[in-house]
Amino acid sequence: MGNILTCRVHPSVSLEFDQQQGSVCPSESEIYEAGAGDRMAGAPMAAAVQPAEVTVEVGEDLHMHHVRDREMPEALEFNPSANPEASTIFQRNSQTDVVEIRRSNCTNHVSTVRFSQQYSLCSTIFLDDSTAIQHYLTMTIISVTLEIPHHITQRDADRSLSIPDEQLHSFAVSTVHIMKKRNGGGSLNNYSSSIPSTPSTSQEDPQFSVPPTANTPTPVCKRSMRWSNLFTSEKGSDPDKERKAPENHADTIGSGRAIPIKQGMLLKRSGKWLKTWKKKYVTLCSNGVLTYYSSLGDYMKNIHKKEIDLQTSTIKVPGKWPSLATSACTPISTSKSNGLSKDMDTGLGDSICFSPSISSTTSPKLNPPPSPHANKKKHLKKKSTNNFMIVSATGQTWHFEATTYEERDAWVQAIQSQILASLQSCESSKSKSQLTSQSKAMALQSIQNMRGNAHCVDCETQNPKWASLNLGVLMCIECSGIHRSLGTRLSRVRSLELDDWPVELRKVMSSIGNDLANSIWEGSSQGQTKPSEKSTREEKERWIRSKYEEKLFLAPLPCTELSLGQQLLRATADEDLQTAILLLAHGSREEVNETCGEGDGCTALHLACRKGNVVLAQLLIWYGVDVMARDAHGNTALTYARQASSQECINVLLQYGCPDKCV
């Protein structure tokens, strides 16, 4: 059986004839291999087609019978090889394949009026070695090609598309020229139609062009093309506005915040064990804070950010001497004298005021003689020299890497400038807030002036500088260390000079004092020897644990029929601070959270906030009262604090998460 080639004619393809040779040459892009069941040889189809001189004029008055409107003899339909008109085209050795393909393609076009077969728009002509030389094959291709416009015109009326999902297009036909290339290959160029062609398996795409006409300056055909709006602006858009869009976009990045001094993309090494480098968008602001984001979008939205306080940090550059180490006052004798050369070789030098000129000012005489091992380590460290490190006062390290040396030096210099500016602004802020510091000093002085606060509450050491918040007492530094070992449940230690003191804490300390506290915690210490300033730490610790942890010296409760919780409610309502402290020292968490009777549901915290007494409210919270508790009316303690207009109570309750809304 001969080798088979197929040529599919599409409506978007026009033909050209050579007036001299007249050969019809289908384009190579329109010739494709058959399916897996077809067999194909490498002979080109154009070489098998005999030339013929044909010129066809197609106009508006041209009317042709379409191929599918013509009746086919029954003999040809069922046995094409038996018909003399078709025997030269369809050979007996391929008639089975031809019939099966023709029937499968024409199943949906059977006419109910006439017993004839109608054929699809997309016609397929089968060519093999023995049929490509027939003299009327050229006319067959021309007839099929010229009747395509008639089919498309009639298709709009029937609404019967031969090809599924094919859209309707307008069609106009002008003069069709068919010519053959000199190289023997064919080309089919469309000069008149805008109809999309059916898909082709060819690797080359056909080129379409519209020739100029003599009558009109515009093309003859009216193209109906669907343009993509992917790169076009919307209707009614302002061109000037579009040109200004990039500028406005750059201006709106990070709007509403301080403009960074320096910003850009840097690589940051993760702190996990993988040690991977990821891109981060880093900003450096004038407030001395270095912030890095996962991306530029996160920076614009101000989300997923992490900040580094440069005021308490320093910067290190691998392979660079620290600025303080460049002094000529301290020569380095050997590499084993003080370890500075080791730090230099390993690239861990500290750079506080780095600049390119600083490293060059170091005298070569001061450099220690390098050893072979040191040179090897230094060579290994030079593999990545565009990185720098930021180290905080707590030892946390952030590794960053720039793309070039210049970019790294620019970042290092900018960060060093902000570190220096932050330190200077810290000094200036201290000088500006001298009046506030003086007022705080006066408040702390009032705490020290409380009765008994001139000496340590446990060992009588003079001028104590440490405090226990929930006990309301002052102590020496040695006793404060023992109090810390008790835990915050028993003693909350704070420095009188180093820590901040809000208003509510100052009020608590100014309301209790050492004498009042000792009258409660040492109320039953008769016959016990209290440690002195010269006592050992073991003696002081033994006394403190017996006093606060075991409560051996605690004053007894008053004799009454009321429970401890009811006594606490009454003392809170009467604002009796000394009795309340005694009851809190004896009571448990359940007794502290006891509510008022008669269905009221108020706790001692509700009563303290109703009175606006921040001292009692704070002490109750420290001793375990439920901040989320509500009374019978669904009100929290914050509701009563707002009714009493006590801002101190409101601040304390909000700090501990008290809900604001009623149920």
Curated annotation (Swiss-Prot):
Residues 185-216, 231-255, 359-381, 519-540 are annotated as: Disordered. Residues 203-216, 519-530 have a biased composition (Polar residues). Residues 188-202 have a biased composition (Low complexity). Belongs to the centaurin gamma-like family. Residues 259-420 form the PH domain. Residues 441-561 form the Arf-GAP domain. This is Arf-GAP with GTPase, ANK repeat and PH domain-containing protein 4. ANK repeats lie at residues 600-629, 633-662. Encoded by one of the numerous copies of centaurin gamma-like genes clustered in the q11 region of chromosome 10. GO terms for molecular function: GTPase activator activity; GTPase activity; zinc ion binding. Putative GTPase-activating protein. Residues 235-250, 531-540 have a biased composition (Basic and acidic residues). It comes from Homo sapiens. A zinc finger (C4-type) spans 456-479.
